[in-house]
Regions:
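Membrane-proximal N-terminal segments immediately preceding the first transmembrane helix
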Residues: 2-3, 12-37, 56-72, 94-102, ...
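Hydrophobic alpha-helical cores of multi-pass transmembrane domains in eukaryotic membrane proteins
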Residues: 47-61, 80-98, 115-132, 152-170, ...
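Transmembrane-helix exit/juxtamembrane "anchor" motif
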Residues: 98-102, 170-177, 242-261
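Non-transmembrane, juxtamembrane loop and terminal tail segments
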Residues: 2-33, 256-280
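Juxtamembrane membrane-interface segments at transmembrane-helix boundaries in membrane proteins
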Residues: 29-42, 68-85, 113, 140-153, ...
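Juxtamembrane loop segments immediately following a transmembrane helix
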Residues: 163-188, 198-225
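Polytopic transmembrane helical bundles with strong interfacial aromatic enrichment
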Residues: 2, 7, 36, 40-46
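Membrane-helix exit/interface motif
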Residues: 62-68, 95-106, 129-144, 167-177
Length: 280
């Protein structure tokens, strides 16, 4: 063992009171640290994907089996595309786009950015299809547009989601934005992404309740299979959101620093604490 290694071990042992079996013992740190966190992380990511995919499947079964299937003809079957597209787009794909920075934390940042933006684009397209479907149905059935809290929340979420995607494209994928501009917008972008996911799930819960009251209001209190299935969908959506927020906000799951991120941090610190940046 080199002199430097002996000094390092002595320092670690001194922090634990000199006891080899203490919580800061070097061997224990090596044995129980990253591997254990990695396995927990993988399990949580897997659980989130199961919850998200099952939510989409439940929505498809609900609309396909209990509500008559899917079509693009202005009928109620066209409306059935709305919940399916919104759960797939604004919830599952949106959540997965956020999660790629944790799952692919060791990949090149540019590749992860492209994947993040591409999944968000797919989520946006899918959600627009869902909104067009419900507007078509309302027009064909002479139902007023945008009168419910669900519709207000859904349209607001979609507009903000679209704006979020455009702003992310301008600030992080196009090379025009300076480092200090990106550093200023980065925490806003992260906060808005999670907020929009919460808004999407909350609006979905409103939509589930609204659909049940319109479709099976009289039998809903009798725990009919359709009502129970829709309630389970709501629970799964909430659990998906909780897991996503947990994975994204835990410090140990954050992407390891790289030169680009360190530069952003320097600029952000300069903006918030004052002083001149070390680099232009």
């Amino acid at each position: 063992m080199t002199h430097q290694s002996r000094q390092t071990r002595a320092c670690l042992l001194s922090l634990g009171g000199g006891r080899p079996g203490s919580s800061v013992d070097l061997q224990n740190m090596e044995d129980s640290g990253p591997d254990r966190r990695g396995s927990v992380f993988a399990g949580l990511v897997g659980a989130s994907q199961v919850l998200g995919l099952v939510s989409v499947v439940i929505t498809g079964v609900w609309m396909g089996h209990y509500r008559g299937g899917f079509a693009w003809d202005g009928s109620a079957r066209e409306f059935n595309l709305h919940p399916l597209c919104m759960v797939l787009g604004l919830v599952l794909l949106h959540g997965d786009a956020i999660l790629v920075y944790r799952v692919f934390s060791n990949e090149a940042k540019k590749k992860v950015k492209l994947l993040h933006g591409t999944i968000h684009l797919l989520a946006l397209i899918t959600s627009i299809v869902g909104v067009v479907a419900v507007f078509d149905f309302h027009s064909a059935s002479l139902i007023p547009h945008l009168y419910s809290l669900h519709s207000w929340g859904g349209l607001t979420t979609l507009i903000l989601f679209s704006s979020q995607w455009v702003m992310g494209l301008l600030f992080f994928l196009f090379p025009g934005a300076s480092s200090w501009l990106r550093a200023t917008y980065l925490p806003i972008h992260v906060f808005c992404g999670l907020t929009l996911l919460v808004m999407a799930i909350g609006t979905s819960l409103l939509g589930i309740t609204e659909k049940l009251l319109f479709s099976i209001e009289s039998s809903y209190p009798q725990f009919t299979p359709e009502g129970v299935l829709a309630n389970i969908l709501g629970v799964f959506l909430v659990l998906f959101g909780v897991l996503l927020c947990y994975l994204v906000t835990r410090e140990e799951y954050r992407r390891p620093p790289n030169p680009e991120e360190e530069a952003l941090s320097v600029h952000f610190k300069t903006l918030t604490e004052g002083g001149a940046p070390a680099t232009p």
